[in-house]
Amino acid sequence: MKLTLVRHTSLDIASNICYGQSDVDVSAQFDAERQTLQTKLSKFEFDAIYASPLQRCHKLAHALCADASLGFAATDIQIDPRLKELHFGDWEMNTWDAIPREIFDVWANDYANLAPPNGETFTQLQLRAKAFIEDVSSHLHGKNILVVTHGGLIRALIAEVLQMPLKGLFRITIDYASVTQLEFKDEIPKVHFVNH
């Protein structure tokens, strides 16, 4: 199974805001970013499309399906809550500077195992991403799947495929409207490309 992971387009929010699972809308650059993405995706054929339920992903999936080149209708989009971004709990919609430095630093040193208050750990995010992969591959084995999701989830899946510690996640750049492709075949999953 090939998994083509698309990160949502840029957002209508200041860059210093922690947003995670908050349902933030897309920016004014949405149409231009979507067109560029559509061109990138036109090189591939897909058998199914999945998206996070957050509007920044759902909107993009709908817009991509509106172009007949993908071969999907909006009704073909399968929404899966396991594809959501990391839940930052009480930190959501606060500026990063508003989070007490001593608390943030402890979390930043072990975000794989520590959660923001009322949030989740990156390990929990990775586990739900893996559960999604296992479910989808059980009935779409050998197929090409398009997934519209978030940077944190894409990084967690790359870490899983490369068997790297989650501590190194933020060494991987995943830009808005970028494409990453992973393959789950046989015993050894592979990274085909990242942040294209």
Say what each PLM segment does.
Residues 8, 150:
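Short, conserved phosphate/pyrophosphate- and ester-handling motifs at nucleotide-, phospho-/glycolipid
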Residues 51-52, 127, 148-149:
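Short beta-strand scaffold positions
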